[in-house]
Every structure is written in structure tokens, then in C-alpha cells.
Amino acid sequence: MDTYSSTLPVPYHFELTVACPAGPQNYKIMDIAGMDKYLDFWNLMAYDYSGSWDQVAGHQANLKASKGNSGATPFNTEKAVEHYRKQGVAALKIVLGMPLYGRAFENTDGLGKPFSGVGEGSWENGVFDYKALPLPGAEERYDEEARASYSYDPARRHLVTYDTPRMAREKAEWIKKNGLGGAMWWESSADKVGEQSLVGTVVGVLGSMESTMNCVEYPHSKFENVRKGFKG
């Protein structure tokens, strides 16, 4: 990429990044130190910690582990970031990924409890866009120990794990406290607008969005904005 860049009229720095796992069964077999020499930053996929594949209902994007209810937190973001840092990755190169969707569990008495089925969703079974949450009849709750949010409908015995504005704000403060490089999401079309926007909440805490100039050069594109290099 650097060699190619040197042949261009304007030599760009092309960024090389990776979407990296937050589960130890995956990150422990990676040559993180070797990869870090070439990567500009690491996008940590800090979500999908729990889901339809599990035996009990759990948090899908918690910051910390729950000692009192370990079944609810099979993974946690704090431990994942700690591992990458110990492998030599600078905190500023780690970008915290956050979900703009929730994972559902049906017929369950709560976190760490068995469930049966995940039900329907916004675009696949058991997965709801954040903008559709909380579901009618559900109340939003916060897990102090795991540092995670979710909603629960006791009448339907239906639980959905997802980030709320409170959780987004807490994660943004955690990013600042630990000197991380920023935040990213999967994916923006599922966000709410206004004060309930998770992206907007995080940006409000961090201060701004990424504003690096685009390095797209495609003068023959049929799209005017591409021909102009996405200059706005």
C-alpha cells in the first residue's frame, strides 16, 4: 500500500485496520504484536457476547464481568482491551465497537437464567434495531456490576440486551478514561434520532466525530460526489 501510494500524484497514507474479536478463544490465537506493526488501529467488536447460541440469557455488550451472576457475562470488554494492551497495542489505536441493536431471549426469568427461543426481530430472529427498543411492555434496567443495560418484560418473560443512552454515555466516559482511540458501531441505520441517539450521545461526550480527509480518487465515477472525492 505504501509503495502504491508513492506512485500517485498526491501520496496518500492508506490506513490499514482490522475488526478484531473480543472473545479470548479468538484473540489468544492471534499474533497481535506482529499485526500491530502494520495496523493503524484496531476496531474491537465488543458485542454479541451472548445470543441464541447460549444456554442462558446474558449481556451482549457489557463492560465488566459479573462475579455475582457469571453466567450473564461470558465475555467482557474490560478484559479484552486489557489483553490487547498487554500485547503492546497502544490504547489510542483501540476503537471500541458498540451495538445499535439488541439480542432477545424468550421464556426466561432473567439474566443468567435458561431461555427458550429468541422470537422474531427487526431483520432476523432475535435481533431488534435499537430504534425499536424498548419493546411495548418492557422496562429498561441497568446492571451495576456488569456495567450493562437491558430491558425485561416480566409478563412475557422476554429479555433484550442492548445499549441505552445511559450506557452509551458510560462507555464514552470509559473510552476517555482509558485513552482509547474512539468508537464505532454496527450499524448506524438502527440508531434513534435526537437525544436518544447512541451515536450522538457518544459524540457529545468525546467532543467530535472523526474528520480525517478522504483519500478516494476516482475522477471517472458516474457519481458526482465520488468524482469530487467526497468533499461534501
Predicted ranges, named:
Residues 121-180:
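Hydrophobic, secondary-structure "cap" segments at the distal end of domains
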Residues 1-133:
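Substrate-binding surface in catalytic domains of secreted glycosidases
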Residues 103, 157, 163-232:
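Acidic/aromatic/glycine-rich contiguous surface patches that form carbohydrate-binding/processing clefts
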Residues 14, 21, 153-154, 181:
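Generic signal for short, ordered secondary-structure residues
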Residues 80-87, 135-143, 224-231:
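Noncatalytic linker/hinge segments flanking ATPase motor cores
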Residues 77, 97-101, 150-154, 228-232:
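A broadly tuned preference for mixed-charge, low-complexity surface segments
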